[in-house]
From Swiss-Prot:
Function description: Component of the post-replicative DNA mismatch repair system (MMR). Heterodimerizes with msh2 to form MutS beta, which binds to DNA mismatches thereby initiating DNA repair. Msh3 provides substrate-binding and substrate specificity to the complex. When bound, the MutS beta heterodimer bends the DNA helix and shields approximately 20 base pairs. Acts mainly to repair insertion-deletion loops (IDLs) from 2 to 13 nucleotides in size, but can also repair base-base and single insertion-deletion mismatches that occur during replication.
Gene source species: Schizosaccharomyces pombe (strain 972 / ATCC 24843) (Fission yeast)
Chain sites annotated for binding ATP: 759-766
Principal subcellular localisation of the protein: nucleus
Gene name of this polypeptide: msh3
PANTHER family: DNA MISMATCH REPAIR PROTEIN MSH3, DNA MISMATCH REPAIR PROTEIN MUTS FAMILY MEMBER
UniProt protein name: DNA mismatch repair protein msh3
Subunit structure: Heterodimer consisting of msh2-msh3 (MutS beta). Forms a ternary complex with MutL alpha (mlh1-pms1).
Highest taxon in the source lineage: Eukaryota
Gene Ontology CC terms, in alphabetical order: nuclear chromosome; nucleus; site of double-strand break
Source species taxonomy: Eukaryota, Fungi, Dikarya, Ascomycota, Taphrinomycotina
Length: 993
């Protein structure tokens, strides 16, 4: 195929030409076909059908599997020799030959490697480049925007070695799995080996995906950008089991394991879920995994939800990789785990193995199955050792914190706003003033799971108050320490996986600080010195300058003076001896090179002769062109107008010997460095604890910086009362250029527990109820709240039902989703819950919506008795104030009405006051919003007329239907019989509305 070029104008010609060349052996099948997942990735993410596979203008698009076309838009395949269309037609008509393709040694090596990595992109080190072949080259060219060309039997693409990390990051962020294939021998070592005339040995050095990459950015200082969310690197493994006895109801048991390798976090969970998979949705919202692992045994409903998550993330520019795994039964999974821990902990003894298995057996069977799948998956990347650090298995749920649902996270805009789905305008954007990346991640976890234990909350608030209003040197010292810390959490994972050490260790080597008044601060600060002796010991072995430059050859201070007779140190003795010998050999070669230089000076009669470097070639001899003493056996390297560059045979021999010693020294130094890191890993748990301490301090200081602002107050807590004076919305007051209108609220378990809030559209109803929930989350996370004063109960949950959206992944309409979410709220609410229901029933007809809203509001007040904020556009619900007198009160958002001439029509204009006022608003004034949006006056006039006529005509009929529907719904919600006499009495006020 080499040297051929095509000008294809018809798809049939392309197919025939491709077929002919396959018969001739000019193109290998591996070069032609893309795997299904790869095609899907290219179609979905690059838009190949529109741009990538087009020939010259006016030509038809051809099969995307054919490698005969331009790979990068607006770039042409390089050709060596052209073939005319006539020659192609003649070739097509001729009988195909049966001659097989002759692969080059490098191509054969690629094919051998590819056998074990069919669904993986291979980046193969060849000299100073990394090359891609066949279908890998095609994908790489599309994703990276590099040229793709034929050479011998395969498509080829390449990138320079010094840019490989940048390109690898782009490939894995595209959702691909990439294997880095490196040369295991250098030219210097190859030239001295018995296999010097054979191909370089190449092996897979590492396999990378988005979730298995240990970020090299740890070695670069990265100041946190306030309010920016870091990309999640969680890998989520899911398994479920449909309960046959409850199959019709859609109930299912779900187990999961979530892994974040960069921070060394492993989370397990098991729960019962419904048809909507609302609990699984909540976990997805918390973890935001970049990789999903599941088997074909997963239920169709769960698969549909995961697919919906993948597509949703894709619309936001994030690619989620899906890995299908083999799911074993729990018995075989336990056997696999027993074998795994036995092999990993063989040196630690049977007790350690028993402890690991005891932890595993305490998990639910589905979580055990997920753990087995997760370990099997990570073995491909040599990262399975994470699970040996069993101290950091964490349950998703905790009795000391609440878990906010997906609806709460999204509806309250905790991490992204609902307009453009960016962090700006979210609660996290307001509160994030952290200094470190790991502190920023911890703050995110704090907001996802506010505390429910009063003592823990008060401890945090005490610490925040002291940090906010204590300007002494101790606080400043802590801030200064945190300010320049790298990402220690990721750095520790790199230590554990033997990727790096010095900067992580030096960051931990800090002085302790004297005690604070806060018990939490004292406890945190006192933990820092506990690790200092370990850190100081390790740091004492390093040459700081060489370690910071990552020079492993000269990194250790005492390796040259290492005495084999001393007691064992933290380095390997045999390797140390080998390193000393190699350094001595290098010194001897360099000394001999100096002697040879003196010989050359004498021979050439040039006493100032020195070795020079030409490019990457060392020890060059430069002589003028007029020199007559050049022996014939000298090797000419290059020349200029005035001089020649040579190597003598002796220089070449010594250079080969020197390069061999230097390469062996690098290899031995790498080995001793990894041996050293394995000793450090024994202290991983202690280092991890200190990282947690520093992250906690960072979060507390972040809260302190917010809490010290004017208008923020420390919340107090009560078992029976919610009383906030001049409550404000933390995000709106920052985003708006107008002064925010504060509001008061007073709820009590012994008195009014429910507010029924009505009012005009855009009047601030939703913002008001959201700001109360946000204040509760801030208070229970340990932060001051935006108010003049705040007295709050400690809520065990904050349940939200607001907004409207369908769920096409499980064929659910907007109204069905609305009802299922309402059912979820009703099933989880307790008397200690804050419940927010916003505009329930708007996904169906008006009368059905009214009836459902009435029944749900009645049920929550009659039986659950939560702290309830019920926002509605149905003023008829105000009759429940009489039914639940002293327990429910009606309020509306204040407004002013005025009559304005609207050209030929008259329309009411509304001015919003954003103030909570007692009573029910008789209308929602939706036409006013239409007026503000610029709807033509003729339409507004007609709509006003129709609205008034409809109200007059259907009022009585609606009342009777409404009563029947409410009675039926209440009977469904309650097992008890309905008191119809009381119900009709309560509803008599309906006639007046």
């Amino acid at each position: 195929m080499r040297g051929m070029s095509y000008n294809i104008t018809h798809e049939c010609d392309a197919i025939n030409i491709l077929s002919d060349n396959l018969h001739e052996g000019a193109i290998s099948e591996d070069m032609v076909a893309l795997s299904g997942p790869a095609i899907e990735l290219l179609e979905n993410n690059v838009g190949s059908s529109k741009n990538s596979y087009q020939e010259d203008e006016g030509s038809s698009s051809i099969d995307e599997n054919a490698p005969l076309i331009s790979i990068k838009r607006k770039r042409r395949i390089r050709t060596v020799k052209s073939t005319s269309n006539k020659e192609l037609v003649q070739r097509k008509a001729s009988k195909p030959t049966k001659q097989k393709s002759v692969f080059t040694p490098l191509e054969q090596q690629y094919l051998e490697l590819k056998k074990n990595y069919q669904e993986t992109i291979l980046a193969i080190e060849v000299g100073y480049k990394f090359r891609f072949f066949g279908k890998d080259a095609k994908i790489a060219s599309e994703v990276l925007g590099i040229s793709c060309y034929f050479e011998h039997n395969f498509l080829n693409a390449s990138v320079p070695s010094y840019r490989i990390d940048y390109h690898l990051e782009r490939l894995i962020n595209f959702g691909l799995k990439v294997a880095v294939v490196r040369q295991t021998e250098t030219a210097a070592l190859k030239s001295t080996s018995s296999s010097r005339n054979t191909l370089f040995d190449r092996r897979v050095a590492r396999v990378l995906t988005k979730g298995t990459t240990l970020d090299d950015s740890f070695f670069r200082f990265e100041q946190t950008q306030h309010g920016t969310l870091q990309a999640s690197q969680f890998i989520l493994c899911v398994a479920d089991n449909v309960d046959k006895s409850k199959a019709k109801s859609g109930r299912v048991q779900v187990g999961l394991i979530a892994i974040q390798l960069s921070s060394g976090t492993t989370v397990y969970d098991h729960f019962q879920d419904d048809f909507l998979r609302s609990e699984l949705q909540t976990r997805l919202s918390h973890f935001q995994p970049c990789e999903l692992i599941y088997s074909n045994k997963l239920s169709s409903e769960s698969v549909a939800l995961l697919n919906h998550y993948v597509s949703t993330e894709k619309t936001c520019g994030r690619v989620v990789r899906v890995q299908h795994a083999v799911q074993q039964d729990v018995k075989l999974a336990l056997e696999n785990l027993q074998d795994f821990f036995s092999s990993k902990c063989i040196m630690s003894g049977s007790k350690i193995i028993e402890l690991h298995m005891e932890k595993v057996k305490s998990l639910h069977s589905l979580s055990i199955i997920c753990l087995d799948m997760a370990i099997s998956y990570l073995m491909e990347f040599s990262l399975e050792d994470l699970f040996v650090a069993s101290n950091f298995y964490q349950p998703f749920d905790s009795i000391s914190s609440m878990v906010l649902s997906k609806q709460a996270l999204e509806g309250l805009e905790l991490f992204v706003n609902q307009t453009d789905h960016t962090p700006v305008g979210s609660l996290f954007w307001v509160l994030d003033r952290t200094y470190t990346r790991f502190g920023q991640r911890m703050l995110q976890r704090w907001l996802q799971k506010p505390l429910v234990d009063k003592e823990n909350i008060i401890e945090r608030l005490d610490a925040v108050e002291e940090l906010a209003f204590n300007s002494n040197s101790q606080v400043q010292a802590i801030r200064k320490m945190l300010y320049r810390l790298p990402d220690l959490e990721k750095g520790l994972s790199r230590i554990y996986y033997q990727r790096g050490f010095y900067k992580a260790a030096s960051a931990f080597s800090k002085n302790s600080y004297s005690c604070f008044k806060s018990a939490l601060l004292r406890r945190l600060i006192q933990q820092l010195p506990s690790i200092s002796s370990i850190i100081d010991h390790f740091l004492g072995m390093f040459d700081q300058k060489e370690a910071e430059n990552n020079n492993k050859v000269d990194m250790f201070k005492d390796i040259d003076n290492f005495d084999l007779s001393e007691e064992p140190n933290d380095v390997d003795y045999e390797l140390a001896q080998e390193i000393r010998e190699l350094k001595m050999s290098i010194l001897m070669v360099r000394t001999e090179m100096d002697f040879h230089l003196q010989e050359l000076r004498d021979y050439l009669e040039y006493p100032n002769l020195e070795f020079s470097i030409w490019g990457n070639v060392k020890f060059c001899i430069e002589v003028s062109k007029g020199c007559k003493k050049i022996p014939p056996d000298w090797i000419k390297l290059s020349s200029t107008r005035s001089l020649f560059r040579f190597h003598t045979p002796k220089i070449q021999s010594l250079l080969i010997e020197l390069s061999s010693h230097e390469e062996n020294l690098t290899i031995s130094s790498e080995k001793i460095y990894r041996s050293f890191l394995s000793r450090i890993s024994e202290h991983y748990n202690e280092l991890r604890n200190v990282t947690t301490v520093l992250g906690t301090l960072d979060c507390l200081i972040s809260f302190a910086r917010i809490s010290s602002q004017s208008g923020y107050t420390r919340p107090e807590f009560s078992d029976k009362e919610l009383l906030i004076h001049e409550s404000r919305h933390p995000m709106i007051e920052l985003l708006s250029d107008k002064s925010f209108v504060p509001n008061h609220i007073h709820l009590s378990s012994d008195g009014v527990r429910c507010l029924l809030i009505t009012g005009p559209n855009m009047g601030g109803k939703s913002s008001f109820v959201k700001q109360l929930a946000l204040s509760a989350i801030m208070a229970q996370s340990g932060c001051f709240v935006p108010a003049k004063s705040a007295l709050l109960p400690i809520f065990d949950s904050i349940l939200i039902r607001m907004g409207s959206s369908d769920n096409l992944s499980v064929n659910m309409s907007t109204f069905m989703v609305e009802m299922l979410e309402t059912k979820e709220v009703l099933s989880k609410a307790t008397e200690k819950s804050m419940v927010i229901i916003d505009e329930l029933g708007r996904g169906t007809s008006t009368i059905d919506g009214e009836a459902i809203s009435y029944a749900v509001l009645h049920y929550l007040n009659q039986y659950i008795k939560s702290y309830l904020l019920f926002v509605t556009h149905f003023p008829s619900l105000g009759i429940l104030e009489r039914r639940f007198e002293g327990q429910l009160r009606c309020f509306h958002m204040g407004y002013l009405k005025s009559k304005e001439d609207f050209e030929t029509s008259v329309s009411q204009s509304i001015s919003f006051l954003y103030k909570l006022v007692p009573g029910v608003a008789s209308k929602s004034y939706g036409l006013n919003v239409a007026r503000m949006a610029g709807i033509p006056f003729s339409i507004l006039s007609r709509a006003t007329e129709i609205s008034e006529n409809y109200e007059k005509k259907h009022r009585n009929a609606r009342k009777n239907v409404f009563i029947r529907k409410v009675a039926k719904l209440l009977m469904i919600l309650n097992a008890e019989e309905i008191d119809f006499k009381r119900l009709f009495y309560d509803l008599t006020a309906f006639e007046e509305i």
